[in-house]
Every structure is written in structure tokens, then in C-alpha cells.
């Protein structure tokens, strides 16, 4: 189920992030390969065995990574029908580890930022539905965060990341709020 890592990075640094994760994975004996597109702002590290992506996240300290802004363990890319995306996601995550929050993200590129408005609206509706049905628990005991990484309104990766071993900020980018004058 979790044979892939989606790794977000700054656009143009995909090759450096690929080299970094490949080296770190090899150090702990988990092998795979990277799929990337130059300038996409993310890449995939596909592990040789199912479950290895979560094992990588257990053994590598996220804060020790230099080029990777955010990560999540997931399966293959999903193509969801626009008619009932929330229902489809709810059905898919029944076998996922218990999560305590939802984070909707997209590539930090010009094309990716166009998904921002959709991501905010969809994320809010999805979180409300999952909390209402009890699929997402508010307790910190869960320790995992559900991630949706949007590529379009219907294409996405659905995965998880440990709350304490991933970036605390959406898309791995800290945002500063300036006081009003």
C-alpha cells in the first residue's frame, strides 16, 4: 500500500532531493528509484517493497534532510471522479493508519499555485466530513497526518506522514504573519 514517498522540494531542486533520498535510503538498506520532472517542485521515490515508504519515514529524521520540504508515504497516483471525490477518499482511507488531521497540498510552482483556492475549499469540506464520520480523530494519540497532494482537480496522491517526523507547515514552507499597522 505505501510503496512510494512524495517529496516536496523547491522547484529546480528535484535532482538534489532525489540524490539525497536515494543515498539516505541506501544507508538503511531500502532500495528504490526516483521519478521526477525538472521544475515540478516534487518527486516520487518508489520503494522496492510495499510498506518500505513508512519504514523510511521511521528511520530517517525529517529534520536531517536538506532539500526536502515535506514528505508523505503513499501508493500510486489516484484519478478521482469529480462527482464524489470526498466519498472516494473516505472509502480509500479505511485501511490507513489512524490520522488526527488532514493536509491538502500542491506543488509550489506557478501551475501548482493555481490549485490553491480549490485546495482550501476542498480541504475544509473533506476535514469536516472525515471528522463527522470519525475517520479522523482530533486526539494527538494518532500521531499521523493524512496528506492529499493535488496535481489537478481529479489527480492526486493520498498518503500519510508522522506528525512528529514531517514539516509542521503546509507544503513545508513556514509562513510569517506580519502585524497590521
Q: Each predicted region: which residue ranges?
A:
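Non-catalytic nucleic-acid substrate-recognition regions in nucleic-acid-modifying enzymes
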Residues: 2-10, 14-142
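Hydrophobic residues embedded in beta-strands of well-ordered beta-sheets
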Residues: 43, 154-156
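A short glycine-rich, hydrophobically flanked beta-strand micro-motif that places a catalytic Asp/Glu
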Residues: 144-147
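Charged, structured surface patches that assemble and position nucleic-acid processing machinery
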Residues: 149-151
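Glycine-rich adenosyl-nucleotide cofactor-binding module
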Residues: 156-181
Amino acid at each position: 500500500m505505501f510503496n512510494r514517498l512524495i517529496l516536496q522540494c523547491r522547484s529546480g531542486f528535484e535532482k538534489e532531493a532525489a540524490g539525497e533520498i536515494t543515498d539516505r535510503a541506501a544507508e538503511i538498506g531500502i532500495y528504490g528509484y526516483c521519478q521526477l520532472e525538472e521544475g515540478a517542485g516534487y518527486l516520487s521515490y518508489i520503494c522496492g517493497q510495499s510498506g518500505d515508504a513508512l519504514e523510511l519515514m521511521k528511520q530517517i529524521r525529517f529534520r536531517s534532510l536538506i532539500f526536502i520540504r515535506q514528505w508523505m508515504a503513499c501508493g500510486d497516483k489516484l484519478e478521482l471522479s469529480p462527482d464524489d471525490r470526498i466519498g472516494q477518499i473516505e472509502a480509500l482511507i479505511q485501511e490507513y493508519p489512524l490520522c488526527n488531521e488532514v493536509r491538502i497540498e500542491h506543488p509550489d510552482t506557478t501551475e501548482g499555485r493555481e490549485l490553491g483556492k480549490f485546495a482550501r475549499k476542498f480541504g475544509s469540506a473533506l476535514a469536516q466530513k472525515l471528522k463527522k464520520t470519525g475517520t479522523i480523530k482530533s486526539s494527538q494519540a494518532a500521531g499521523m497526518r493524512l496528506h492529499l497532494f493535488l496535481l489537478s482537480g481529479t489527480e492526486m496522491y493520498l498518503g500519510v506522514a508522522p506528525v512528529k517526523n514531517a514539516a509542521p507547515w503546509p507544503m513545508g514552507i513556514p509562513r510569517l504573519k506580519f502585524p497590521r499597522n
